[in-house]
C-alpha cells in the first residue's frame, strides 16, 4: 500500500471515530451558517484538526487544502492533500446517518491516492492511481449500463446555486422519463463511492468544490467509471460540475444536460 494512503486512512478513521462519538452528545454540537444553505459545526473543525495533525506528523512539508481551514502552505508545493473532514454536514446536523470523511492526495496536479470513510457503516473506500478501488479491502468495479433504462442515478439539488434551479429541473425531468429512480443522499463523496460499488448506476451534480469530489472521483475512476464535466471534458475540479457512470451512462446523461441545460452550466 502507498505510504500516503496509509496515513490518509489513519487520519480518516481517527476523524470518523470522533464524528461518530460526538453524535452521542448531540446537544454539544454547535452549528453556524457559512453561506446560503451551507453549514459548519464545531465537529467539522475538530475533525479537520485531527486530520491535519495526523498528516503533519508524517509529512510536515506537504500542502493541505481543507474545507474549513483553506490552504495550509507547506515547503513541498508538489504534494497537496485535499480534505473534507465531514462531507454531508447537513445530514450530520439533522442526525441523518449518511456522511463521510474524504481525503485525497494530489502529486503535481494528479490525484494519486484517495480514501472516503463512512463512520456510521464502518465502510472504507480507497483507491490508488493505476491500482483499482476497494471497499474494506475488497475490489470494486462499476457494472456497465447500456442506457438509462432501469438505471438508478444519484444527484443533488443545487441549493447553493439556485440561479440554476430551472435548468436543473429540466434536466431532471428529461432523465425522469428514462431512468428507474433517483437517489439524493447529501454526500457527494459517498455518491461517487456508491457508483464505484455498483449501488447506483450514475451520478451528476453541479456546483461542487474540489474537496467534495477529489477523493470520490479517483475511487470511481479506479473502479472503471468515466468522469467528466458537463461539457464532456475533464475540467470538473475547476467547474464544479461532474458526471460519472460507465461510458454509455455518461453519454446518455451528457445528452440530457446538453439538451436541457443553460449555457452557464455547460462546463
Swiss-Prot record:
Gene3D superfamilies: 3.40.190.80, Fructose-1,6-Bisphosphatase, subunit A, domain 1 (3.30.540.10). It is found in: Cytoplasm. GO terms for cellular component: cytoplasm. It holds the Pfam family Inositol_P. Substrate binds at residues 67, 86-89, 183, 212. It comes from the Bacteria. It catalyses: a myo-inositol phosphate + H2O = myo-inositol + phosphate. The keyword Transcription regulation applies. GO terms for biological process: inositol metabolic process; phosphatidylinositol phosphate biosynthetic process; ribosome biogenesis; signal transduction; transcription antitermination. Homodimer. The rRNA transcription and antitermination complex (rrnTAC) consists of RNA polymerase (RNAP), NusA, NusB, NusE (rpsJ), NusG, SubB, ribosomal protein S4, DNA and precursor rRNA; S4 is more flexible than other subunits. This is Nus factor SuhB. It comes from Vibrio cholerae serotype O1 (strain ATCC 39315 / El Tor Inaba N16961).
Amino acid at each position: 500500500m502507498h505510504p500516503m494512503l496509509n496515513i490518509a486512512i489513519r487520519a480518516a478513521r481517527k476523524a470518523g471515530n470522533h464524528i461518530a462519538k460526538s453524535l452521542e452528545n448531540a446537544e454539544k454540537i454547535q452549528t453556524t451558517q457559512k453561506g446560503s444553505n451551507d453549514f459548519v459545526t464545531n465537529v467539522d473543525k475538530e475533525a479537520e484538526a485531527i486530520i491535519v495533525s495526523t498528516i503533519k506528523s508524517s509529512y510536515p512539508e506537504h500542502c493541505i487544502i481543507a474545507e474549513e481551514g483553506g490552504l495550509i502552505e507547506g515547503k513541498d508545493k508538489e504534494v497537496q492533500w485535499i480534505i473534507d473532514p465531514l462531507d454531508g454536514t447537513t445530514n450530520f446536523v439533522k442526525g441523518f446517518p449518511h456522511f463521510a470523511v474524504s481525503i485525497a492526495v494530489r502529486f503535481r496536479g494528479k490525484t494519486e491516492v484517495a480514501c472516503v470513510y463512512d463512520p456510521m457503516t464502518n465502510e472504507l473506500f480507497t483507491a490508488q492511481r493505476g491500482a483499482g478501488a476497494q471497499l474494506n479491502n475488497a475490489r470494486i468495479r462499476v457494472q456497465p449500463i447500456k442506457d438509462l433504462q432501469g438505471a438508478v442515478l444519484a444527484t443533488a439539488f443545487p441549493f447553493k446555486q439556485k440561479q440554476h434551479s430551472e435548468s436543473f429541473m429540466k434536466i431532471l425531468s428529461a432523465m425522469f422519463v428514462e431512468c428507474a429512480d433517483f437517489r439524493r443522499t447529501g454526500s457527494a463523496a459517498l455518491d461517487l463511492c456508491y457508483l464505484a460499488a455498483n449501488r447506483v448506476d450514475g451520478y451528476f451534480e453541479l456546483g461542487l468544490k474540489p474537496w467534495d469530489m477529489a477523493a470520490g472521483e479517483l475511487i470511481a475512476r479506479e473502479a472503471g467509471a468515466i468522469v467528466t464535466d458537463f461539457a464532456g471534458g475533464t475540467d470538473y475540479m475547476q467547474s464544479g460540475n461532474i458526471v460519472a457512470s460507465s461510458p454509455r451512462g455518461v453519454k446518455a446523461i451528457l445528452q440530457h444536460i446538453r439538451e436541457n441545460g443553460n449555457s452557464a452550466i455547460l462546463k
